[in-house]
Every structure is written in C-alpha cells, then in structure tokens.
Amino acid sequence: ETPHVLTPYKWALYGPFNCETKTDFDQKEFPENETIVAPDSLHWAKGRRNIAQPTWLESENTWIDFARSFRRNFGGNVGTQPVKSSAYALAEIKSDKDKNAIINLGFDDWIKVWVNDELVLTSTHDKGFAVRQIPVTLKKGKNKILIKLSNFDNIEWRCWAFSCRILNQEL
C-alpha cells in the first residue's frame, strides 16, 4: 500500500541573509530565534532586498523556489537570484493524532530543518542536488516546519529550491 503523503501548501518566506561561510549559516536570524525582534519594514542588505515581513509562496508539486521571491533588483538574466545567501521557509502541517512520519527533502546547497522548534537535520551538501529522509514525530494538531536553505556561487547556483513531502507512518 502506498503511504499517504502530506505537504505544506503555503509557506512564509524570510530573507535573504548574508551567508558566505559555515559561521554565517549557523547565525540565528529572527525566523529561528524568537528573542530577535523582526524588523518592521523592508531594508537593504548588501545590495539585495531583505524581507522582514513574510512573503507567502504556494508550493508547486511539493517545491518551494526561493529564487521567485528573492531575485535581485537588477535587469536581465545575470545574477537573478542572490548567491552567498540563505533564507527561511516556515509552514504548518496538521496531524489528526500523534504519529511517526518521514520528511522527504530534496534540496541544493546547505539546509537546516526544524520540526516544532527541534532541529532535526543539518546538511552542508555542496555538490549538486541532494535527497534526505528524516524520521520525525508529529503531534496531534498543528506542527511547525522551519527550513533554512543557502545558495552559493557554484555550478548549481540557479537552483535555490527545496521539495518537502511528509510520509505518515502509523504509531
């Protein structure tokens, strides 16, 4: 029998943030640190628009493409999405009961994933596209999923996206 697949449909995106090194990637920005107050308005950071209030994006067949929301304000096709950057995506998924699940992720570059404020994955994958399966426990009701994804100036820099599918496993 094929397992039931859930995927968050709507994501709140925040960013981009400077991310040139592992130290930068480990820097806690306001989406992952509730003690940091989000700015009230948009502001400029290193030649790119930094989004303080969320931009909402609907997933397309489980995919969230950061490049659609964080393109630089330059004309033409050169450098359309920021490199040496990271951004966050936040969504909720509802569960009818406490249950074990597997999060299937597809992504490029570095990623961190939290479920209900618990860090469940850190991956500093540098070469091409990667897939990871993460066992998690969903609680009855709303479950928060927060993803931080980087984009670097490498051969795959045009791919600043991730796919998130949740396979239910009955307890």
Regions found by a protein language model. Give the residues of each.
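Extracellular and analogous surface-interaction loops
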Residues: A89-A101, P135-K140
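Accessory carbohydrate-binding/adhesion or oligomerization-edge regions at the termini
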Residues: E1-R71, K148-L171
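Residues that act as N-cap/strand-start positions at coil-to-secondary-structure junctions
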Residues: S85-A87, K97, F107, A130
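Aromatic-lined ligand-binding clefts that engage carbohydrates, nucleic acids, or primary amines
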Residues: S95, N100-V113, I145
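Extracellular beta-rich ligand/substrate-recognition surface
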Residues: G75-A87, T122-K127
